[in-house]
Amino acid sequence: DKEGGSLYLLDVVGTDDTMLSDLQDREEQLLLNLGGTAVGTGINATLAYVGQVVPLLSEMTGIPFTQSRDLIDTTQNTDCYLALSSALKGCAASLSKICNDLRLMSSGPRDGLGEIVLPARQNGSSIMPGKVNPVIPEVVNQIAFRIIGYDTTVTLAVEAGQLELNAFEPVIFDSLYQGLVMLQHGIHTLNVHCLQGVRANEEVCRQEVERSVGVVTALCPKIGYNAACSLAREALRTNRPVGKIALERGLLTEQELQTLLDPAAMTSRCSLQDTEVDAVKGKM
């Protein structure tokens, strides 16, 4: 279902967008130890410099930096970078999960699921004509693998600080920068060269729904669990549709089956009507 698939993608990306936005708004991401000099004590710095350097930097950049109230702690610990790296890894992992789904759902065309068709971007093989590989999702998968590795690097670098200083900020900054750039390019590539051209293989999807035994779950509220189990066993044994067996047994009318086994209703987020939800709430 195109609408359902789009909603799923938006939900996943939206969650990560919220996480990154929350991270951006967190005060510690804008804290600076500037003015603390060597180890955060402010040695050899004038009070005028210590008091004015951060406000002047904020004015010059337009970024609302604030000076840490504990310059020693901010100099010793670089955990704020770890929070950013973790959020970046979470976003990459979510995108990689989407790409895993795309690769699996597009597998085929004969022996896989074949529920969706990805745009062909290059010849898949020099020895097998017609072979098409999901190269764009694979690219984003590999970007995610690299970003997860970067996060491990950042974690170890943050942990490796000793006493008043952390000497490993160069690899922290390089890992974060590389990860941010790669993820930005990966998202653009996935969107432009894959997602915009994805189409549903409607015939395959329709056939899979019709032959699925799992749809018997939608009949449980109407015919009961035991009767539904019996239908499932019969459908598996005879390789016949669940709906036809239910109709033959007189368990449901054809109209009831059309309503209960409607793919759109079964895949919607909640099949309860607003009035039913209100009624349930009223009984609680």
Q: Can you name each region flagged by the protein language model?
A:
Residues 2-13:
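Conserved beta-strand signature within the Rossmann-like core of class I S-adenosyl-L-methionine
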Residues 21, 28-284:
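Conserved, well-structured ligand/cofactor-binding cores
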Residues 16-23:
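C-terminal substrate-binding/active-site "lid" region of AdoMet-derived donor-dependent transferases
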Residues 14-15, 237:
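Short Gly/Pro-enriched loop/turn and capping motifs at secondary-structure junctions
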Residues 4, 25-27:
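N-terminal functional modules and adjacent low-complexity/disordered segments of proteins
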